[in-house]
Regions:
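Beta-strand/loop substructures that line and gate deep hydrophobic ligand-binding cavities in soluble
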Residues: 75-127, 134-135
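Residues at beta-strand starts and edge strands
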Residues: 2-4, 54, 68, 82, ...
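Hydrophobic ligand-binding cavity/cleft-lining segments
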Residues: 1-42
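Short beta-strand-to-loop capping motifs
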Residues: 10-12, 50, 74, 104
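Generic structural detector for well-ordered beta-strands
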Residues: 7-11, 49, 59, 87
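A short, structured loop/turn motif at beta-sheet edges
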Residues: 11-15, 62-66, 88-97
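Glycine-rich portal/gate segments that line the openings of hydrophobic small-molecule binding cavities
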Residues: 25-77, 83, 119, 133-134
């Protein structure tokens, strides 16, 4: 099973970052606009439409307010297994770190998944840095 870990830092406050991340039905407006263009909530899940046209159903495993961590599992697409998590970590000097981990099969999808994660994190950083400027 392949595993990727990516992280970014932002000037946005950790509580504001977590508020946007935990809003599981608003990826396309509050966290990664452009990377995700639509999010529709279903019982225990969300249907996510990415900017490249890919649609996936993501089962929401947990939204942990104490740890500021969300876990989901993607269903559909080219992967036979996908488990993702994202965590908001308060850092030094008013900086907030976001850690995104993806575990998936088949291993051969690593390149494509890594590119998607990098694109998603770039959109997230832009959105969150803009949020920091408006506080």
């Amino acid at each position: 099973m392949a595993s990727l870990r990516k992280e970014i830092a932002t000037r946005a406050r950790a509580e504001d970052v977590w508020d946007a991340m935990r809003d599981v039905g608003a990826l396309h407006t509050r966290l990664v606009p452009g990377f995700v263009i639509d999010t529709r909530l279903e019982p225990g899940a969300r249907m996510v439409t990415f900017g490249n046209g890919t649609m996936l159903r993501e089962l929401i495993v947990t939204v942990d307010d104490r740890q500021r961590r969300i876990v989901w599992s993607a269903v559909g697409g080219l992967l036979s297994h996908h488990n993702g998590s994202a965590q908001v970590v308060e850092g030094p000097n008013s900086e907030t770190k976001i850690v995104w981990i993806a575990d998936f099969l088949p291993d051969q999808a690593s390149g494509a998944i890594e590119r998607m994660m990098e694109e998603g994190l770039a959109a997230m950083k832009t959105t969150l840095d803009r949020l920091a400027e408006n506080v």
